[in-house]
């Protein structure tokens, strides 16, 4: 019999959202997950599944039953011939990487954070960068889904294909993902090259940058023209690192956090901070080489609020210049660095922000120095207005103000997804406040 805990308080990684579920479960088997769902049906309770808890929104929150998948974290099968790995949905990617290393395999693309679960990263449409690469869910070739009534569906392009196209970005509302099969590639090393540029240069030569580097992204420092360009490409060079505790931590974290805290009293300092830290930390060329997963992932040191929308790739220049013009016209609106700009190939996953179009993701950020919230509403609203104007779609894991009406316009397949959701979960067992805004 599965045991539930009362009095557990859940908080996301950034401590920006939290909840107190009525019961908190940590199942170790499919049968135990089934027991939780049976209990929920019997007591008419809602259920939310949580993984690494990194989503900077309330997508995982509930006052009903919460299932934490951390104890269902095994590698079930490695097929070296097909280069595929099947894992339980609760495995952290950080724990999967060394297992793949043993077999000479790797995932072709990863997000910045690896303390996230296999079931969670596909659920929210996690992405990285690389115009030849899709969001992480495009690497999923099969999955198993436990539905509200206790049925297990085996899903792939050849079995329950329509559910598969929905479940690869499932928002946690179709059922409980039990296993995920990922398409891997042979293990590879990456060289990361970082160098300074300007916003004008990067936007004027965007196609050239995208052709030059397989995994190209750039960081714009608001209230300036400064840009840090980041190329990541296959290499045979031995591992090397430009990491330095003094610059990365003493300056890049401790001093920055202190100055950002001071700027909560003197907001005019933010532009100076952005320019100063670009000059201090990003004004020269740097190179790092390592195994792919050690280059793709990096440590997020700051608690933060973020927004991240995917827009049509061809709208990149227009959107960024409009955001820059808005900040120049409204000097009281301040924006922390960086605005991170990444690029992703289009796909056919029903609620993927990259559905049927190559996309540019534009991530804005406001840090919380020493846990203190910084006024961001004007910046947030101006950004959302620009994103909607250019046809943007918000990252599902990150906070946004969109409703069903917005999503019906944004997603050609939204009604198809809704029909699948209503068929798999007719009573709304897997809904919560966040998802009610999406579907109602």
Swiss-Prot record:
Its EC number is 1.1.3.8. Pathway: Cofactor biosynthesis; L-ascorbate biosynthesis via UDP-alpha-D-glucuronate pathway; L-ascorbate from UDP-alpha-D-glucuronate: step 4/4. The modification Pros-8alpha-FAD histidine is found at residue 54. The chain crosses the membrane at residues 253-273. It catalyses: L-gulono-1,4-lactone + O2 = L-ascorbate + H2O2 + H(+). One of its GO terms (cellular component) is endoplasmic reticulum membrane. Residues 17-187 form the FAD-binding PCMH-type domain. Keywords: Ascorbate biosynthesis, Endoplasmic reticulum, FAD, Flavoprotein, Membrane, Microsome, Oxidoreductase, Transmembrane, Transmembrane helix. GO terms for biological process: L-ascorbic acid biosynthetic process. It comes from the Eukaryota. It is found in: Microsome membrane; Endoplasmic reticulum membrane. InterPro entries: ALO_C, FAD-bd_PCMH, FAD-bd_PCMH-like_sf, FAD-bd_PCMH_sub1, FAD-bd_PCMH_sub2, FAD_lactone_oxidase-like, Oxid_FAD_bind_N, Oxy_OxRdtase_FAD_BS. Its cofactor is FAD. It is a single-pass membrane protein. GO terms for molecular function: D-arabinono-1,4-lactone oxidase activity; FAD binding; flavin adenine dinucleotide binding; L-gulonolactone oxidase activity; oxidoreductase activity. Belongs to the oxygen-dependent FAD-linked oxidoreductase family. Oxidizes L-gulono-1,4-lactone to hydrogen peroxide and L-xylo-hexulonolactone which spontaneously isomerizes to L-ascorbate. This is L-gulonolactone oxidase. It comes from Bos taurus (Bovine). The lineage of its organism: Eukaryota, Metazoa, Chordata, Craniata, Vertebrata.
């Amino acid at each position: 019999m599965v045991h539930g805990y009362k009095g557990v308080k859940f908080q996301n990684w950034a401590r920006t959202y939290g909840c107190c579920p009525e019961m908190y479960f940590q199942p170790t088997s499919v049968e135990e997950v089934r027991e939780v769902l049976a209990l929920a049906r019997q007591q008419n309770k809602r259920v939310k599944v949580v993984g690494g808890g990194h989503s900077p929104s309330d997508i995982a929150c509930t006052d009903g039953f919460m299932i934490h998948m951390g104890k269902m974290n095994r590698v079930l099968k490695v097929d070296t011939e097909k280069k595929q790995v099947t894992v339980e949905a609760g495995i952290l990617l950080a724990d999967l990487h060394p297992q793949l290393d043993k077999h000479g395999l790797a995932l072709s693309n990863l997000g910045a954070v690896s303390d996230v679960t296999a079931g969670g990263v596909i659920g929210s449409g996690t992405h990285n960068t690389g115009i030849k690469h899709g969001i992480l869910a495009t690497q999923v070739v099969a999955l198993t889904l436990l539905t509200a009534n206790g049925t297990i569906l085996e899903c792939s392009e050849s079995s329950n294909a329509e559910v598969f196209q929905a479940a690869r970005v499932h928002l946690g509302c179709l059922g409980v993902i039990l296993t995920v099969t990922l398409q891997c590639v042979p293990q590879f090393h990456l060289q990361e090259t970082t160098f300074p540029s300007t916003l004008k240069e990067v936007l004027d030569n965007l196609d050239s940058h995208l052709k030059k580097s397989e995994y190209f992204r750039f960081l714009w420092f608001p209230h300036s023209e400064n840009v840090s360009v980041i190329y990541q490409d296959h290499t045979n060079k031995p591992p090397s690192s430009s990491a330095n505790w003094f610059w990365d931590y003493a300056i890049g974290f401790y001093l920055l956090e202190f100055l950002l805290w001071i700027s909560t009293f003197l907001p005019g300092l933010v532009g100076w901070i952005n320019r100063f830290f670009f000059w201090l930390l990003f004004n020269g060329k740097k190179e790092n080489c390592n195994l792919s997963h050690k280059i793709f992932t990096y440590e997020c040191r700051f608690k933060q609020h973020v927004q991240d929308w995917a827009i049509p790739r061809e709208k990149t220049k227009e959107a960024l210049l409009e955001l820059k013009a808005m900040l120049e016209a409204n000097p009281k609106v301040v924006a922390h660095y960086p605005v991170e700009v990444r690029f992703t190939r289009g796909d056919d996953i029903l609620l993927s922000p990259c559905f049927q179009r190559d996309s540019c993701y534009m991530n804005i950020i406001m840090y919380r120095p020493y846990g203190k919230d910084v006024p961001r509403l004007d910046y947030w609203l101006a950004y959302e207005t620009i994103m909607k104007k250019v046809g943007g779609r918000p990252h599902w894991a990150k906070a946004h103000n969109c409703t069903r009406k917005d999503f019906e316009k944004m997603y050609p397949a939204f009604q198809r997804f809704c029909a699948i959701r209503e068929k798999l979960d007719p009573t709304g067992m897997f809904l919560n406040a966040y998802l009610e805004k999406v579907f109602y």
